[in-house]
Regions:
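Helix-to-loop junction immediately C-terminal to a conserved catalytic motif
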Residues: 50
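The feature captures the beta-strand-to-loop junction immediately N-terminal to the Walker
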Residues: 35-37
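H-loop/switch region of ABC-family ATPase nucleotide-binding domains
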Residues: 197-198
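Conserved structural motif at the start of ABC-family nucleotide-binding domains
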Residues: 4, 18-21
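Conserved ABC ATPase signature
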Residues: 136-140
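H-loop (His-switch) and adjacent beta-strand-loop-beta switch element
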Residues: 210-223
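Catalytic Walker B motif of ABC-type/P-loop ATPase nucleotide-binding domains
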Residues: 161-164
């Protein structure tokens, strides 16, 4: 089932068009990694799909950005005097009552989301998970903050998750763990997940399809092996990136 459908989409800013005439669709149940040189428009496209900035032309259909999308940006801002629990709980606010009170179900989803990203089991006796939830968000490293923001996106339980370089601050084991988690959510829960990344090796190994973007040639969307065999990565990055 097609969930995101872009037709002749142009993205950018009032003074500059970054990409134009993009037509592609993303399906439910797949994880797509978006690759491309710096400045080609990956983050701009994500922000447009999330509804944070208007398209300059064309259409985006198949979902409602404000209701159906969770977005994780690459910048990790400090939120002073706020616990990890409270940051993740922000993902549940659209579902709370007028008073903003969290239900027992909300609390369970918060715990499960953090446990998934942390690679822990969500049990009542898990004291390390409880300590992490109660800790100060601003006191953590950028990598830990990034995992908390991913947990917040999971807690929103939206059909579409958009992530801008979600593994940028993580070490290799946690990069793999996060991408494995996102792929499992796509395959098992039918989510549409689009990730902007520079992790070419992991994207080739773990994504269902790759959206390859270049300033000159627009986009190509295909399985990783198809793009590699066609020499698309070499052309996009201007060098033989598969030499040893």
């Amino acid at each position: 089932m097609e969930r995101i459908v872009c037709s002749h989409l142009s993205v950018g800013y009032a003074a500059r068009v970054v990409q134009q005439d993009l037509s592609f669709s993303l399906s439910a149940g797949e994880m797509v990694c978006m690759l491309g040189p710096n400045g080609c428009g990956k983050s701009t496209l994500l922000r447009t799909l999330a509804g944070l900035q208007p398209a300059l032309g064309g259409t985006v259909s198949g979902y409602q950005p404000s209701a159906d999308t969770a977005l994780v940006l690459s910048s990790v801002d400090a939120i002073e005097r706020t616990t990890v629990h409270d940051v993740v709980a922000m993902g549940r606010y659209p579902y709370t009552s007028v008073m903003g009170r969290l239900s027992e179900t909300d609390e369970q989803i918060i715990n499960q989301s953090v446990a998934q990203v942390a690679g822990e089991e969500d049990t009542d006796g898990n004291t390390s998970l409880r300590r992490f939830l109660e800790s100060d968000f601003s006191a953590h490293s950028d990598g830990e903050k990034q995992r908390v923001l991913i947990a917040k996106a999971l807690a929103q339980q939206t059909p579409v998750i958009l992530l801008d370089e979600p593994t940028a601050h993580l070490d290799l084991p946690n990069r793999i763990r996060v991408l494995q988690l996102l792929r499992r959510l796509a395959h098992e829960e039918g989510k549409t997940i689009l990730i902007s990344t520079h992790e070419l090796d992991l994207a080739i190994r773990m994504s269902d399809r790759i959206l390859l973007m270049t300033p000159q040639a627009g986009i190509q969307l295909a399985p990783p092996d198809d793009l590699r065999n066609a020499g698309a990565f070499t052309r996009a990055f201007g060098m033989d990136i598969f030499c040893y």
